[in-house]
A protein has these predicted regions:
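Short, ordered loop/turn segments at secondary-structure junctions
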Residues: 1-2, 27, 50-51
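Beta-alpha junction/loop-to-helix N-cap segments that form part of ligand/metal-binding clefts
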Residues: 27-30, 39
């Protein structure tokens, strides 16, 4: 969820604030890509997310397609054939969400099980509302309730992230469905709550802390070299998506 007006206001503020560097923790909205490119010509900018081939801006890439593939491979290895995937709105301005879902679907398609994956995404207008701390939790909870009315034969339910997965788990608990005995639940992000001992949640770690450090390294190097442009990929730290 993001507020386009707020994003535009903050971007325009950069010309007056003139910070030493800017770290963008998500892909810029499509309508602001040109503006971000103009800012990057004057101020060091690093983006943490899916690198956009249309932008000549340094990025620490979060490969959401790979994350989706890793999630699917794990479930397939455990024998899960009929699964559901619950996500926030899969809109054009939130492409990283779609990439994660697409990666997941590709793995199931490889083994001829694409039609065994149920995708339930929240309605697009939800992204227009102001995000609350429990917004994603509610998506997981409410869409799981809907799912259980439609089918009861899935053996695993995936949440786009851990907060959605928590909502999934609560909806299953209310329906007297045991996790992971009856249905397995998987999230992504390895948040603090997902690591609690009594939380039967499988989650994917993709080292966000390291990516933030890498983005800082990019900014510092650009400042030190007077905002020179890298001619190729410069690896900073190495880590596995699993």
């Amino acid at each position: 969820q993001r507020d386009l007006r707020m994003e535009e206001r903050y971007l325009k503020m950069m010309w007056q604030l003139r910070p030493l560097g800017i770290i963008y923790t998500c892909n810029p909205s499509h309508c602001f890509m040109e503006l971000v490119g103009e800012i990057a010509e004057q101020i060091p900018v690093a983006i943490v997310n899916n690198q956009n081939e249309k932008m000549n801006v340094d990025a620490v890439e979060l490969d959401n397609s790979k994350l989706g593939r890793v999630m699917a491979k794990h479930l397939l290895e455990l024998g899960h054939r009929k699964v559901a995937y619950i996500a926030p709105p899969l809109t054009a301005r939130q492409k990283q969400r779609s990439k994660r879902v697409e990666g997941f679907l590709k793995e199931y398609e490889k083994v001829g099980l694409r039609d065994q994956v149920i995708i339930k995404a929240a309605k697009e207008e939800i992204d227009l509302d102001v995000a609350h701390i429990d917004s994603e939790y509610k998506i997981g909870y409410e869409l799981t309730k809907e799912l259980l009315k439609e089918t009861t034969d899935v053996t695993a339910i995936v949440g786009l992230n851990d907060m959605i997965a928590f909502g999934i788990m609560d909806a299953l608990h209310e329906a007297k469905i045991k996790v992971p005995t009856d249905v397995s639940v998987m999230g992504c992000d390895n948040t603090l709550f997902a690591r609690m001992h009594n939380m039967n949640l499988t989650t994917i770690e993709h080292f966000v802390t390291f990516k933030g450090r890498d983005a800082c390294d990019i900014i510092m190097k650009k400042i030190a070299t007077h905002h020179s442009t890298n001619t190729g990929a410069v690896p900073i730290s190495t880590y596995h998506v699993e």
